[in-house]
Structures are given as C-alpha cells and as structure tokens.
C-alpha cells in the first residue's frame, strides 16, 4: 500500500490530542505504523520521505524515551532534526512560549514537536505557527503518541483491541497517558478499567466511560492488559498516599496482584519505571512485560504521525512533496 493510499482520508495537520481523532483516523495511523515496524528491523533503516524537511523538538520537560523516539523517527524518515536545548535557550531569559514559537516559525520548520508542563501549550503553538505541531505531552492533559504506541503494542501482541479488558492502574489523577489511553481504547472497542485509591482519581472520572475500582483484586480480575502508571510526585502538592510501602502493597503490580488477571495478560508501562513503587522488578523484566516492545512501537507510530500530518498539510496547500 502506498503512502498516498494510507493517508488519503486523513484530514489533520496537527496532532494535539486523541480527542480530535475519529476511529477512522486512529485506524489509519495504526495501520501505517504497523507497516513501518518491519522496516525498523532492517539494517538500512533510513527513508527519504521527509528528505529536505525540518523537524524541531521543543521539550520544556525532561524526557528520555519520547524525545529520543521523535528524533529517531524523524531521522528514519530522512528529516533534518533539531532538538532545542531549553536550558541554554532564551526561555531561561524570560522569553514566552509564543515568542519562542514565532521565532522558530521564522526558521520555516515543517514539523514542531512540543512537550510542556502547561495543558493546552501545543494547541496554543498550533495557532501561532505555519507548520505541523505534535503534542508530546502537555501537563496532565494528553499524550497522544503514547496512546497510539500502546494501542499498536496491544494490537500486535493480542491480535486485536476490540473486546479486550484493559486495566489502567496507578496515578490516574495526574496522568496525561491515562487520559489519552482512555480515549483511544474506548474508541477502539476495549473495555477500560481504572484502578487507584480515591485520592488519585480525577473528579471527572465518572464521565470518562470507564469502570472504576479501588482494589487490584477486583480491578484486575479477567484483565487482558495491565497498564501501570508511575506516581507523578513532581505534580503532587499534598499527601496523596500514606506511604510508598503501603501503596506498593495495595496498588503495585507484584506476583500476588498479578495472579488476579488472566494468565496470558500483557503488562505495559509508559516509563520511567519506579521499581518497587508501582511495579516489582521481576514483573517489569518478566515474560509478560511489553515495556521494550512499547519503545520499539513508539518509533513506528511517530514516523506514521509525521508522515500523515505533513501529507495532509501538503495536500491542503497544494505543495508538491
């Protein structure tokens, strides 16, 4: 299938959140990402799809997996990739996000990838620049490419998403990963559960079309997929749990709690992992863990997203590839 066939019905020029995508949009991106996976296993991994195009990564929050994944995805497609060193930039001198955006826009990039601590930062940027904008995480709001790579991991491992029971466990309140995954997995036909102490659940959880559990025993019963989330202590301003030790006992994934799920369930984690806090080392490194597969799928997904957005923008502008 050619690139044009994949993206002929994809209308978006930015990826700001899963909430903006239809089931058809999700399917297009996942199908293209799935087609990218075999290519990533070849010795020669470089394509020329984005040759002559410029990608700028603008990360205002620390990142290892996501930033390096976007860098590799862009380079695999042949783009010129520049990652801004925020610590050495004018942002540290008081420059606003909008001023930074307009400065970068003057450099005529084709793709701008942003991670920021403020919800809505990517959407604001998209209004100020003339290129494709990809949200790599905005506060506790959304992380769309993480949800896409999680969906691809599940789909390739389990053969489907529709009809599966997916349990998302941990700090739901502060997690942009949880929000994006709830949206995508619900849209793709999964039964989504969340498991957390009441202090780590958002007030809006009742409106998210999920089943809510306050114990791992009940929440993991019959689960096909377990997605563990770390405690985001950098976003916490009060006391949300009695102690780390107690939290791990009741809400961590260890052998005792894992036994409640299906014997063939798979385990996901967006990283970074806090071993002994939300997941035991033997589980994170065990045969049911798909954590390294998620990293691999991340490159395939981000390649697909950049291809799709740029293809849509070029069609809208009438510019040749």
From Swiss-Prot:
Carbamoyl phosphate binds at residues 65-66, 115, 143, 146, 271-272. SUPFAM superfamilies: Aspartate/ornithine carbamoyltransferase (SSF53671). It comes from the Bacteria. GO terms for cellular component: cytosol. One of its GO terms (molecular function) is amino acid binding. Pathway: Pyrimidine metabolism; UMP biosynthesis via de novo pathway; (S)-dihydroorotate from bicarbonate: step 2/3. Its EC number is 2.1.3.2. The keyword Transport does not apply. Coiled coil: none annotated. One of its GO terms (biological process) is 'de novo' UMP biosynthetic process. Keywords: Pyrimidine biosynthesis, Transferase. It is an enzyme of class 2 (transferase). Heterododecamer (2C3:3R2) of six catalytic PyrB chains organized as two trimers (C3), and six regulatory PyrI chains organized as three dimers (R2). Catalyzes the condensation of carbamoyl phosphate and aspartate to form carbamoyl aspartate and inorganic phosphate, the committed step in the de novo pyrimidine nucleotide biosynthesis pathway. Belongs to the aspartate/ornithine carbamoyltransferase superfamily. ATCase family. This is Aspartate carbamoyltransferase catalytic subunit. The gene is pyrB.
